[in-house]
């Protein structure tokens, strides 16, 4: 499965959530609402989830192994950094 598109849909400087991303695989399947979060150890991605109880969330879609998680995280964080640069240039 190949990542064919990564789109930053919402970018913000406020709070821990930095952006929301959609990622397309093989030009056939898209996963929306992947979040980039600023944590204690730096940026990480949070997969789309739904609330399943008081304060509990469950991923709707997620990678099955660490290798795919790393591929996703690398692609999403690269798109985030590129969007951030474009946003800063546009603000000047």
UniProtKB/Swiss-Prot annotation:
Which keywords does this chain's UniProt record carry? Cell cycle, Cell division, Septation
Q: Which InterPro entries match?
A: SpoVG, SpoVG_sf
| An example Gene Ontology biological process | division septum assembly
Q: Briefly, what is this protein's role? A: Could be involved in septation.
Q: Which family does it belong to?
A: Belongs to the SpoVG family.
Q: What is this protein called?
A: Putative septation protein SpoVG
**What organism does the UniProt record list as the source?**
Clostridioides difficile (strain 630)
What is the gene name?
A: spoVG
């Amino acid at each position: 499965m190949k990542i064919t598109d990564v789109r930053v849909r919402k970018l913000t400087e406020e709070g821990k959530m930095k952006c929301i991303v959609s990622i397309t695989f093989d030009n056939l399947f898209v996963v929306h609402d992947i979040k980039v979060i600023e944590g204690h150890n730096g940026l990480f991605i949070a997969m789309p989830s739904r609330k399943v109880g008081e304060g509990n969330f469950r991923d709707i879609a997620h990678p099955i192994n660490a290798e795919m998680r790393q591929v996703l995280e690398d692609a999403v964080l690269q798109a985030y950094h590129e969007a951030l640069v474009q946003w800063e240039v546009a603000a000047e």
